[in-house]
């Protein structure tokens, strides 16, 4: 099996679209490099205005379109 590298994106959390407090699954938007990206995954608690670094893969959801599925996400401390 080939171990694929994860892509990395970073930016500022603009909006929390959905959050499941029971399992930590979050759908949110980040802006970075002039682009707004929808990110989803089990990443825990996030807040609008936080800078984040996420690693994962882009996927096309049949209903919601292109999303970044984060396998890891951490707050980028200044």
Model-assigned labels for residue ranges:
Residues 20-23, 47, 61-63:
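A cross-taxa feature marking solvent-exposed loop/turn segments within ectodomains of secreted
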Residues 4-20, 56:
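Structural detector for short beta-strands of small beta-barrel domains
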Residues 27-47:
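Beta-strand/loop nucleic-acid-binding surfaces
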Residues 18-30:
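Short aromatic-glycine-enriched beta-strand elements
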């Amino acid at each position: 099996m080939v171990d694929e590298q994860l892509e990395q994106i970073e930016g500022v959390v603009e909006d929390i679209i959905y959050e499941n407090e029971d399992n930590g699954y979050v759908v949110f938007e980040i802006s970075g490099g002039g682009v707004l990206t929808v990110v989803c995954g089990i990443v825990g608690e996030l807040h609008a205005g936080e800078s984040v670094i996420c690693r994962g893969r882009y996927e096309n959801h049949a209903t919601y379109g292109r999303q970044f599925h984060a396998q890891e996400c951490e707050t980028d401390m200044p």
